[in-house]
Curated annotation (Swiss-Prot):
Binding site for Mg(2+) 2: 315, 317
InterPro entries to which the protein is assigned, alphabetical: ATP-grasp, ATP_grasp_subdomain_1, D-Ala_lig_Van_CS, D_ala_D_ala, Dala_Dala_lig_C, Dala_Dala_lig_N, PreATP-grasp_dom_sf
Lineage of producing organism: Bacteria, Pseudomonadati, Pseudomonadota, Alphaproteobacteria, Hyphomicrobiales
Recorded catalytic activity of this chain's protein: 2 D-alanine + ATP = D-alanyl-D-alanine + ADP + phosphate + H(+)
UniProt record similarity statement: Belongs to the D-alanine--D-alanine ligase family.
GO cellular component annotations of the record: cytosol
This protein's name: D-alanine--D-alanine ligase A
Gene: ddlA
Protein location: Cytoplasm
Transmembrane helix as UniProt keyword: no
Keywords attached to this entry: ATP-binding, Cell shape, Cell wall biogenesis/degradation, Cytoplasm, Ligase, Magnesium, Manganese, Metal-binding, Nucleotide-binding, Peptidoglycan synthesis
Length: 357
Protein backbone atom coordinates (compact mmCIF):
# COMPACT_ATOMS: atom_id res chain seq x y z
CA UNK A 1 0.00 0.00 0.00
CA UNK A 2 1.40 3.37 -1.06
CA UNK A 3 2.26 5.69 1.79
CA UNK A 4 0.37 8.94 1.98
CA UNK A 5 2.17 12.18 1.17
CA UNK A 6 2.69 14.15 4.37
CA UNK A 7 1.54 17.73 3.87
CA UNK A 8 2.29 20.44 6.44
CA UNK A 9 -0.42 23.09 6.22
CA UNK A 10 0.79 26.39 7.66
CA UNK A 11 -1.79 28.95 8.77
CA UNK A 12 -2.25 31.93 11.05
CA UNK A 13 0.99 33.89 11.09
CA UNK A 14 2.36 37.24 12.15
CA UNK A 15 0.74 39.44 9.53
CA UNK A 16 -2.37 41.58 9.83
CA UNK A 17 -4.09 38.92 7.71
CA UNK A 18 -3.82 36.28 10.46
CA UNK A 19 -7.59 35.85 10.68
CA UNK A 20 -7.98 35.64 6.90
CA UNK A 21 -5.40 32.86 6.86
CA UNK A 22 -7.42 30.94 9.44
CA UNK A 23 -10.53 31.19 7.26
CA UNK A 24 -8.59 30.00 4.21
CA UNK A 25 -6.97 27.13 6.11
CA UNK A 26 -10.33 25.86 7.36
CA UNK A 27 -11.40 25.33 3.76
CA UNK A 28 -8.13 23.71 2.70
CA UNK A 29 -8.30 21.34 5.68
CA UNK A 30 -11.86 20.45 4.70
CA UNK A 31 -11.19 20.00 0.97
CA UNK A 32 -7.85 18.16 0.96
CA UNK A 33 -8.15 14.48 0.02
CA UNK A 34 -7.20 12.62 3.19
CA UNK A 35 -7.11 9.30 1.33
CA UNK A 36 -4.05 10.64 -0.51
CA UNK A 37 -2.47 12.94 2.06
CA UNK A 38 -1.54 12.78 5.70
CA UNK A 39 -2.31 16.26 6.94
CA UNK A 40 0.07 17.91 9.40
CA UNK A 41 -1.54 21.20 10.53
CA UNK A 42 0.89 23.77 11.91
CA UNK A 43 -0.71 26.81 13.53
CA UNK A 44 1.45 29.94 13.61
CA UNK A 45 0.67 32.33 16.45
CA UNK A 46 0.60 36.09 16.08
CA UNK A 47 4.08 36.22 17.62
CA UNK A 48 5.38 33.76 15.02
CA UNK A 49 5.57 30.49 16.97
CA UNK A 50 4.88 27.30 15.02
CA UNK A 51 2.77 24.78 16.93
CA UNK A 52 1.94 21.29 15.72
CA UNK A 53 -1.77 20.51 15.85
CA UNK A 54 -3.44 17.09 15.89
CA UNK A 55 -4.94 16.61 12.44
CA UNK A 56 -8.30 15.58 13.85
CA UNK A 57 -8.51 18.67 16.06
CA UNK A 58 -7.42 21.39 13.63
CA UNK A 59 -10.97 22.02 12.64
CA UNK A 60 -12.72 25.32 12.29
CA UNK A 61 -14.86 27.42 14.51
CA UNK A 62 -16.62 30.51 13.20
CA UNK A 63 -13.28 32.30 13.00
CA UNK A 64 -11.55 29.61 10.93
CA UNK A 65 -8.90 27.02 11.72
CA UNK A 66 -7.92 27.12 15.36
CA UNK A 67 -4.66 28.63 16.62
CA UNK A 68 -4.48 27.42 20.24
CA UNK A 69 -1.82 28.60 22.64
CA UNK A 70 -0.76 25.05 23.45
CA UNK A 71 0.75 22.41 21.21
CA UNK A 72 4.27 21.22 20.51
CA UNK A 73 6.50 23.96 19.09
CA UNK A 74 8.22 22.88 15.88
CA UNK A 75 10.65 24.23 13.30
CA UNK A 76 11.94 23.02 9.94
CA UNK A 77 15.51 21.78 10.12
CA UNK A 78 17.83 23.58 7.65
CA UNK A 79 18.83 21.10 4.97
CA UNK A 80 16.62 18.53 6.65
CA UNK A 81 14.45 17.64 3.63
CA UNK A 82 11.25 18.13 5.58
CA UNK A 83 12.49 17.07 9.00
CA UNK A 84 10.72 18.85 11.84
CA UNK A 85 12.51 19.64 15.08
CA UNK A 86 10.12 19.64 18.03
CA UNK A 87 10.56 21.17 21.47
CA UNK A 88 9.20 18.34 23.58
CA UNK A 89 9.80 17.21 27.15
CA UNK A 90 10.36 13.57 26.21
CA UNK A 91 12.53 14.25 23.18
CA UNK A 92 10.19 12.55 20.69
CA UNK A 93 10.34 14.03 17.20
CA UNK A 94 7.58 14.13 14.57
CA UNK A 95 7.99 12.39 11.23
CA UNK A 96 9.34 14.49 8.33
CA UNK A 97 6.92 16.17 5.94
CA UNK A 98 7.04 15.79 2.17
CA UNK A 99 5.63 19.17 1.24
CA UNK A 100 4.79 22.45 2.95
CA UNK A 101 1.55 24.19 1.97
CA UNK A 102 1.62 27.82 3.21
CA UNK A 103 -1.95 29.03 3.61
CA UNK A 104 -0.60 32.36 4.78
CA UNK A 105 -1.45 35.85 3.59
CA UNK A 106 0.59 39.03 3.79
CA UNK A 107 4.07 39.58 5.23
CA UNK A 108 5.95 36.60 6.68
CA UNK A 109 3.99 34.20 4.50
CA UNK A 110 3.25 35.60 1.07
CA UNK A 111 6.31 37.79 0.61
CA UNK A 112 9.06 35.20 0.09
CA UNK A 113 9.87 34.74 3.79
CA UNK A 114 8.38 31.26 4.28
CA UNK A 115 9.37 30.32 0.74
CA UNK A 116 13.00 31.12 1.56
CA UNK A 117 12.75 29.12 4.78
CA UNK A 118 11.44 26.11 2.83
CA UNK A 119 14.29 26.46 0.33
CA UNK A 120 16.84 26.47 3.16
CA UNK A 121 15.10 23.44 4.68
CA UNK A 122 15.28 21.68 1.29
CA UNK A 123 11.62 20.73 1.31
CA UNK A 124 8.98 21.00 -1.40
CA UNK A 125 6.48 23.83 -0.96
CA UNK A 126 3.31 24.93 -2.67
CA UNK A 127 3.17 28.17 -4.61
CA UNK A 128 5.46 30.77 -6.10
CA UNK A 129 9.17 30.94 -5.36
CA UNK A 130 11.01 33.58 -3.38
CA UNK A 131 11.46 36.21 -6.09
CA UNK A 132 7.93 36.15 -7.49
CA UNK A 133 6.43 36.12 -4.00
CA UNK A 134 8.46 39.15 -2.93
CA UNK A 135 7.91 41.05 -6.19
CA UNK A 136 4.16 40.50 -6.31
CA UNK A 137 3.79 41.43 -2.64
CA UNK A 138 5.37 44.83 -3.31
CA UNK A 139 2.78 46.71 -5.35
CA UNK A 140 5.35 49.31 -6.41
CA UNK A 141 7.82 46.72 -7.74
CA UNK A 142 5.06 44.63 -9.32
CA UNK A 143 3.72 47.63 -11.22
CA UNK A 144 7.16 48.41 -12.60
CA UNK A 145 7.61 44.83 -13.83
CA UNK A 146 4.12 44.66 -15.32
CA UNK A 147 4.59 47.98 -17.08
CA UNK A 148 7.96 46.80 -18.44
CA UNK A 149 6.17 43.73 -19.83
CA UNK A 150 3.81 45.99 -21.76
CA UNK A 151 0.79 45.53 -19.51
CA UNK A 152 -1.37 48.53 -18.67
CA UNK A 153 -1.56 49.47 -14.97
CA UNK A 154 -3.10 52.35 -13.04
CA UNK A 155 -1.00 55.49 -12.57
CA UNK A 156 0.59 55.77 -9.16
CA UNK A 157 3.11 57.60 -7.00
CA UNK A 158 5.28 55.80 -4.43
CA UNK A 159 5.94 57.54 -1.11
CA UNK A 160 8.17 56.66 1.83
CA UNK A 161 8.14 57.57 5.49
CA UNK A 162 9.78 60.98 5.68
CA UNK A 163 9.35 61.57 1.94
CA UNK A 164 5.63 61.80 1.26
CA UNK A 165 5.42 64.74 -1.11
CA UNK A 166 2.66 67.30 -1.24
CA UNK A 167 -1.04 66.78 -1.74
CA UNK A 168 -1.00 69.36 -4.53
CA UNK A 169 1.67 67.50 -6.51
CA UNK A 170 0.00 64.11 -6.12
CA UNK A 171 -3.51 65.36 -6.88
CA UNK A 172 -2.10 67.17 -9.91
CA UNK A 173 -0.51 63.97 -11.18
CA UNK A 174 -3.33 61.54 -10.42
CA UNK A 175 -6.50 63.61 -10.12
CA UNK A 176 -9.16 63.15 -7.44
CA UNK A 177 -10.20 60.94 -5.81
CA UNK A 178 -7.23 58.61 -5.36
CA UNK A 179 -6.27 55.75 -3.06
CA UNK A 180 -3.50 55.47 -0.48
CA UNK A 181 -2.43 51.94 0.37
CA UNK A 182 0.50 50.13 2.00
CA UNK A 183 2.86 48.82 -0.68
CA UNK A 184 3.18 45.39 0.95
CA UNK A 185 -0.16 44.40 2.45
CA UNK A 186 -3.22 42.57 1.21
CA UNK A 187 -6.93 42.23 1.97
CA UNK A 188 -7.31 46.03 1.69
CA UNK A 189 -5.58 46.59 5.04
CA UNK A 190 -4.66 50.24 5.48
CA UNK A 191 -6.37 51.35 2.26
CA UNK A 192 -8.13 54.72 2.19
CA UNK A 193 -9.94 56.67 -0.49
CA UNK A 194 -8.88 60.31 -0.58
CA UNK A 195 -11.31 62.95 -1.84
CA UNK A 196 -9.63 66.14 -0.67
CA UNK A 197 -6.66 67.69 1.10
CA UNK A 198 -8.21 67.11 4.54
CA UNK A 199 -8.23 63.34 4.12
CA UNK A 200 -4.79 63.06 2.54
CA UNK A 201 -2.59 63.25 5.62
CA UNK A 202 -4.67 60.72 7.59
CA UNK A 203 -4.80 58.31 4.63
CA UNK A 204 -1.03 58.34 4.18
CA UNK A 205 -0.50 57.97 7.93
CA UNK A 206 -2.82 54.93 7.93
CA UNK A 207 -1.03 53.32 4.99
CA UNK A 208 2.41 53.91 6.53
CA UNK A 209 1.24 52.36 9.78
CA UNK A 210 1.36 49.00 7.98
CA UNK A 211 4.48 49.54 5.87
CA UNK A 212 7.42 51.88 5.38
CA UNK A 213 6.35 52.41 1.77
CA UNK A 214 2.95 53.40 0.43
CA UNK A 215 1.40 53.56 -3.00
CA UNK A 216 -0.77 56.51 -3.97
CA UNK A 217 -2.86 55.28 -6.88
CA UNK A 218 -5.36 56.92 -9.20
CA UNK A 219 -9.03 56.05 -8.84
CA UNK A 220 -10.10 53.87 -11.75
CA UNK A 221 -13.78 53.99 -12.60
CA UNK A 222 -14.27 50.40 -13.66
CA UNK A 223 -15.49 46.93 -12.81
CA UNK A 224 -13.32 44.65 -10.67
CA UNK A 225 -12.54 41.52 -12.68
CA UNK A 226 -10.38 38.61 -11.49
CA UNK A 227 -8.85 35.53 -13.13
CA UNK A 228 -7.33 32.50 -11.44
CA UNK A 229 -4.15 30.99 -12.88
CA UNK A 230 -3.13 27.41 -12.09
CA UNK A 231 0.18 25.96 -13.28
CA UNK A 232 0.58 22.20 -13.57
CA UNK A 233 3.73 20.20 -12.97
CA UNK A 234 4.54 20.25 -16.72
CA UNK A 235 4.45 24.06 -16.79
CA UNK A 236 1.14 24.37 -18.65
CA UNK A 237 -1.26 27.06 -17.46
CA UNK A 238 -4.99 26.99 -16.88
CA UNK A 239 -6.58 30.43 -16.75
CA UNK A 240 -10.11 30.51 -15.39
CA UNK A 241 -13.00 32.45 -16.87
CA UNK A 242 -13.06 35.92 -15.33
CA UNK A 243 -15.16 36.53 -12.26
CA UNK A 244 -16.42 39.86 -11.00
CA UNK A 245 -16.44 41.46 -7.56
CA UNK A 246 -19.33 43.89 -7.11
CA UNK A 247 -18.81 45.80 -3.82
CA UNK A 248 -21.85 47.11 -1.97
CA UNK A 249 -22.30 50.86 -2.30
CA UNK A 250 -22.18 51.31 1.49
CA UNK A 251 -18.49 50.35 1.60
CA UNK A 252 -17.35 52.69 -1.17
CA UNK A 253 -14.78 50.12 -2.34
CA UNK A 254 -13.87 46.48 -1.62
CA UNK A 255 -12.74 46.94 1.98
CA UNK A 256 -11.44 44.35 4.45
CA UNK A 257 -14.84 44.35 6.17
CA UNK A 258 -16.66 43.89 2.87
CA UNK A 259 -14.40 41.00 1.92
CA UNK A 260 -14.60 38.93 5.07
CA UNK A 261 -17.06 40.14 7.68
CA UNK A 262 -20.10 41.58 5.91
CA UNK A 263 -22.26 38.92 4.27
CA UNK A 264 -23.72 41.64 2.07
CA UNK A 265 -20.43 43.48 1.52
CA UNK A 266 -20.05 42.36 -2.06
CA UNK A 267 -21.40 40.03 -4.71
CA UNK A 268 -18.97 37.53 -6.25
CA UNK A 269 -20.17 36.66 -9.75
CA UNK A 270 -18.57 33.74 -11.62
CA UNK A 271 -18.34 33.83 -14.54
CA UNK A 272 -18.48 37.58 -15.04
CA UNK A 273 -21.04 38.95 -17.45
CA UNK A 274 -18.59 40.34 -19.99
CA UNK A 275 -18.24 40.09 -23.79
CA UNK A 276 -16.25 37.24 -25.35
CA UNK A 277 -13.43 39.56 -26.38
CA UNK A 278 -12.98 40.66 -22.74
CA UNK A 279 -12.81 37.00 -21.67
CA UNK A 280 -10.09 36.39 -24.26
CA UNK A 281 -8.11 39.49 -23.31
CA UNK A 282 -8.25 38.83 -19.57
CA UNK A 283 -7.03 35.28 -20.16
CA UNK A 284 -4.12 36.45 -22.30
CA UNK A 285 -3.18 39.29 -19.95
CA UNK A 286 -3.44 37.09 -16.85
CA UNK A 287 -1.00 34.59 -18.35
CA UNK A 288 1.38 37.40 -19.35
CA UNK A 289 1.23 38.96 -15.87
CA UNK A 290 1.87 35.55 -14.29
CA UNK A 291 4.97 35.06 -16.44
CA UNK A 292 6.15 38.67 -16.11
CA UNK A 293 6.51 38.31 -12.34
CA UNK A 294 8.01 34.83 -12.59
CA UNK A 295 5.07 33.21 -10.84
CA UNK A 296 4.74 29.48 -10.37
CA UNK A 297 1.91 27.15 -9.34
CA UNK A 298 -0.83 29.68 -8.67
CA UNK A 299 -1.84 33.30 -8.68
CA UNK A 300 -4.96 35.40 -8.95
CA UNK A 301 -4.70 38.31 -11.37
CA UNK A 302 -6.98 41.27 -10.70
CA UNK A 303 -8.11 43.76 -13.34
CA UNK A 304 -10.08 46.93 -13.75
CA UNK A 305 -12.44 46.85 -16.75
CA UNK A 306 -13.29 50.39 -17.82
CA UNK A 307 -16.43 51.46 -19.66
CA UNK A 308 -14.52 51.78 -22.95
CA UNK A 309 -13.52 48.11 -22.72
CA UNK A 310 -9.89 48.75 -21.78
CA UNK A 311 -8.28 46.60 -19.09
CA UNK A 312 -5.74 47.54 -16.43
CA UNK A 313 -3.90 44.97 -14.33
CA UNK A 314 -4.56 45.93 -10.71
CA UNK A 315 -2.38 43.38 -8.93
CA UNK A 316 -1.14 39.79 -8.89
CA UNK A 317 -1.83 37.80 -5.72
CA UNK A 318 0.50 34.82 -5.32
CA UNK A 319 -1.28 33.29 -2.32
CA UNK A 320 -4.92 34.08 -3.01
CA UNK A 321 -7.58 33.55 -0.41
CA UNK A 322 -9.24 30.17 0.01
CA UNK A 323 -12.14 31.45 2.11
CA UNK A 324 -15.79 30.66 1.36
CA UNK A 325 -16.15 33.83 -0.69
CA UNK A 326 -12.72 33.87 -2.33
CA UNK A 327 -12.56 34.08 -6.09
CA UNK A 328 -9.59 31.77 -6.72
CA UNK A 329 -11.31 28.41 -6.16
CA UNK A 330 -14.70 29.64 -7.39
CA UNK A 331 -13.29 30.75 -10.75
CA UNK A 332 -11.38 27.49 -11.25
CA UNK A 333 -14.55 25.57 -10.39
CA UNK A 334 -16.19 27.43 -13.27
CA UNK A 335 -13.39 26.02 -15.44
CA UNK A 336 -14.26 22.52 -14.27
CA UNK A 337 -11.52 22.13 -11.65
CA UNK A 338 -12.91 21.43 -8.19
CA UNK A 339 -11.37 22.50 -4.88
CA UNK A 340 -9.79 19.12 -4.08
CA UNK A 341 -8.34 18.85 -7.58
CA UNK A 342 -6.79 22.32 -7.28
CA UNK A 343 -5.04 21.16 -4.10
CA UNK A 344 -3.85 17.98 -5.87
CA UNK A 345 -2.38 19.99 -8.75
CA UNK A 346 -0.61 22.40 -6.39
CA UNK A 347 0.96 19.58 -4.37
CA UNK A 348 2.01 17.70 -7.52
CA UNK A 349 3.61 20.91 -8.83
CA UNK A 350 5.49 21.44 -5.56
CA UNK A 351 6.87 17.90 -5.50
CA UNK A 352 7.87 17.97 -9.18
CA UNK A 353 9.68 21.30 -8.80
CA UNK A 354 11.58 20.05 -5.78
CA UNK A 355 12.59 16.82 -7.54
CA UNK A 356 13.94 18.83 -10.47
CA UNK A 357 16.34 20.83 -8.28
Amino acid sequence: MKEKTRVAILYGGRSAEHDVSRLSAANVLKAIDRTRYEVVPIAISRDGRWRLQPSSEAGADGAGAQVPEDGVEVALLPGGKGRLVALTKNGEQPDPVDVVFPVLHGPFGEDGSVQGYAEVADVAYVGCGILASAAAMDKDVAKRLLREAGLAVARSVTVLKGDVGSFQEIAGALGLPFFAKPARQGSSFGVSKVHDRDGFEQAVETALRYDSKALIEEFVDGREIECSVLERADGSLTVSPPGEIIPADKHGFYTYEAKYFDAEGAVVKVPADVPADVVARTSEMAARAFRALGCEAMARVDFFLRADGSLLVNEVNTLPGFTDISMYAKALAAAGIGYSKVIDVLIEHALARHRAR
